[in-house]
């Protein structure tokens, strides 16, 4: 008997209304956003109620949902107005709130009935009994702690029917389930109340202090300044394991990331899910393309977190091992004229005549070409466009659509293609 596989939700981050619309257009089944209160991303361009309402209406056109993260740790007095806030979210049409603090969970459940509640990863759910506990309190979904292994995930799925949401991509906090007080000490900003200053990613000088007395600098003994941050997670080539083990929602981290990141990563995970559900062979055929695509937006090395083993020093960024993307995001397509094969693009970065670029769009469509016939908004032929947000026109040999993105190889790099169709990026 053939096993029927459930299609998991692709859940994307959206720090702004623009990013929400991009995520939905690029295949997100749901997006998670932050409001003006109770979240953990104070710098993410959080949504007003009016923006939430517009986002909900836009997502609905694509059959997508909007969740709101309200996962801060409550201190005395923070609860004032929470009930009214949750009722407003419910009335706007927010599909669920993502919460970790029991006080906020209680307030949402009692004062905004009908609003679905999901348990945040901050609550460190690592076993099925925990999921059953929260189910008894009315929660419908639990975001597993990032520290859960694939073996544990499979066992949890067998023993509970609570919806499971699991991270598949993005930054990994160096602290357990994100509960960090380093920012409190280093910058007087509470990471558990939205003020994380990412102190773990700062560069530090190390000193050897045996017995806490002598102070010897290790500066000459290590190659770079020390940091204590983790590499990023990527499960793009392990999507079959997530689907086979019954994960209900594949979560992508990154509400503060760019539309280049949101569009690329969402596009890839949607394509991965579609391909595997069509056939394992289809997934294997595009797997390497998906992995290669991820590296175009990666800013750190990528690993699989805790899913297959406990991370070692190889999964930590102890020095200057930052991944520098070879591509830069340069424009978004506004319109395309089939007759003249001309695209109107809104510039986001410097564009030069002759740049090697890649167009990509929803449905994992992409092709490479060169910038030709570059004109400014007044129709003047130009060799270089340095001003962001300017409308430009270029010649494009293949049809593109409004909302497609354009990325360019960074200066001094070119792609060389081999006879087997594979490419290698080299310095020009």
What spans do the regions from the language model cover?
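Gly/Gly-Pro- and Ser/Thr-rich, intrinsically disordered tail segments characteristic of DNA damage-repair
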Residues: 80, 114-115, 119-128
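Alpha-helix capping/helix-boundary segments
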Residues: 103-104
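Surface-exposed amphipathic alpha-helical tracts and adjacent flexible/coil segments at the periphery
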Residues: 1-26, 30-33, 37, 56, ...
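Glycine-rich loop at the start of a catalytic domain that most often binds anionic cofactors/ligands
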Residues: 44-49, 77-85
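Glycine-rich, positively charged N-terminal anion/phosphate-binding segment
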Residues: 41-60
